[in-house]
Amino acid sequence: MPTPSLASLPIRRLTLRDQAACADLSEDRGWPREEHKWGFLLTAGKGYGIDDPDGGLVSACVVTEYGPQDPALAAIGMVLVAGRHARQGVGRRLMRHVVSAMGATPLTLHATPYGRPLYEELGFKVTGRAEMVRGYFTAGGPEPRVATRAATAEDLTAILRLDEQVFGADRTHIVTRLPAFADQLRVAEEGGQIIGYAAAWPNMDTHVVGPLIARDTSVAQALIASLAARTDRPLRTDIDVRHEELLTWVKERGLESLAFNSVMSYGITELPGDWSRRFAPVTVAAG
């Protein structure tokens, strides 16, 4: 029986049953397996993929929608093509399918330099940049005098309200999964009001800090320091490059620059919400 051409292989929705196959695809491309993250994204978002007739996946990606009925925004991430099928138009075909399926919904994604030309070809525009930093956090110098504590169930309403103001869209289905997904979820308080929150979730040998929502840089610093004090793993996070003060601060405390990604959008000229209080995404794959 002849092997079907890549162009004829159907695109289907992925489910949590595809978690291991998605992790295999990550590994195939030299990425960490990140099974914990794949599980989170496949349950909170919509996965799309192409099955390989020889087993596994040819390609995959995940779309995370924000907004209860008509999404105000959708983030595309984890766009991967198996090495043996690279540079044959598979990623382009999958992306075109996703863009078409999302209709009029504004889209965003974080692009590596490798992926950016494809996204530009599809009509995405660069609207910002994020810097990935990683390392063991070493406390030093005057620390911000901002009170932080572990979040409780009673904080959820206030966290959701703050998050929607800052993110610019309803992320209830993401935020409510954080207590199970993350190893730490902490809030910053002033006068009984929550002025920021952050999570640290396990990813291979690191703890990823995200989301990081804070009233200002000093609150963001306090949240990072409080998360770092409660883990023996290196931290990793992706910080909007406009937050120069925070980037300088984390680098002075042991984190090093790993890479820059372009923040791109489709159907909107800039992301909704308040970037000045949005320091890091939950993951670059979900915004």
Q: Each PLM stretch: what is its role?
A:
Residues 7, 13-14, 25-46, 56, ...:
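Basic, Lys/Arg-rich alpha-helical nucleic-acid-recognition elements, primarily the DNA-binding modules
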